[in-house]
Amino acid sequence: ESGYSKNMEAAARYIKSLDSGRLVHYESMLQLKGAEPAIDSPETLDVVSRMYATTEYMENEFLADEKETRPFIQCEYCHAMGNGPGDLEDYWQVIYSNKRFCGGLIWEWCDHGIYAGETESGKPMYLYGGDNGEPVHDGNFCLDGLVYPDRTPHTGLLEAKNVYRPVRVTAQNIQQ
């Protein structure tokens, strides 16, 4: 998550010279779309990569751009903190609607709390931002995964499992 520049493009070209089959994406190239010279180059970036693009953007803007032929991936589209994964199905309905959509990645897999024993009732206790007296911290922002620090699933993982299920059954011509 940084800016995009000619140096990034040179690095992408170098990667392609080493391995022409290697997929290259970089989300921050969108910050300079329309810049001269054009650095959002299909020769160096194989996919259009966005973070948190809305389903409306995907359907109404990305697909409407007739010059853009690359596939689209949400390199980050859902933040698993708290009740964050609540809109996965909406995204996947759009993703399944067009072969140019490649899916998306959830931020992030695991909470980063530090095990600190058990509570009096026997439940695991985890330390996080500020619990060690540090003056600068991100509070509970490190507890934003699909699983707890002990890898027990959050409800968000159960939703993702359902949305990512390998088989979907839909009714077709139900009146016949």
Show which residues each predicted segment covers.
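Extended substrate-binding grooves/exosites of carbohydrate-active enzymes
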Residues: E1-Q175
